[in-house]
Amino acid sequence: LDIDDFKSKLTTKTKLVSLLHISNTLGCCNPIKNISKLAKQNGSLVMLDACQSLAHQKIDVQELGIDFLAGSGHKLCGPTGIGFLWSKREILEKIPPFFGGGEMIQDVFEESSTWAELPHKFEAGTPAIAEAIGLAEAINYINNIGLDNIQRYEKALTKYLFQKLNEIEDIEIIGPPPEVDPNRASLATFYLKNIHSNDLAEILDSKGICIRSGHHCCQPLHRHIGINSTARVRMNFTTEKEEIDIFIEKLK
């Protein structure tokens, strides 16, 4: 994210700044501390989508100066269909519930209702019990491995992946390389000049390699850079260097 461009878009009407920590397509890590500082000077709250970073690096919400943080269960090696929102208590106290149902009320009258204490006022009805238990276990699993260990290992994998991809002719990689953005995600988004990314994904699938192809939920980004679609390969702490070699061999 370009800081000067961000400054130009902040106005007195900006109530909330909502942005990604790490791009799921470009892989770049945004300068959140600087953005939060500018937003606070403007009187704006900051909402951080950390789905792409929570399982890959330590995040200190106090240090970043943010007001909200959103996370996703399945991107933390947990179940699908569950996520979470962190915020400061004083902010959550002011926010009205957005779902109605059992357990989130204190008193109900014909014309009005009062709400239960936090966090219950945001947990209407029967919660996703099994998913919540699974998410907690996934978080424990990641913490036992250690986020510092995970980040160090994934940085080495990312550097190796970019090195091997750059050996392939007619490939264009989208996003900053590891030497430019050392905190970038352990992924690579690219396209080959002589084949559509969807066709590439099908060919690799037939060879036992699963990648993502298309817009990656980022159609405006693809239009901005003038590309119809891209291919993306993603790694995490379970990926081995030998698997990168196999992927590159099949890609060639």
What are these regions (language model features)?
Residues 1-252:
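Pyridoxal 5′-phosphate
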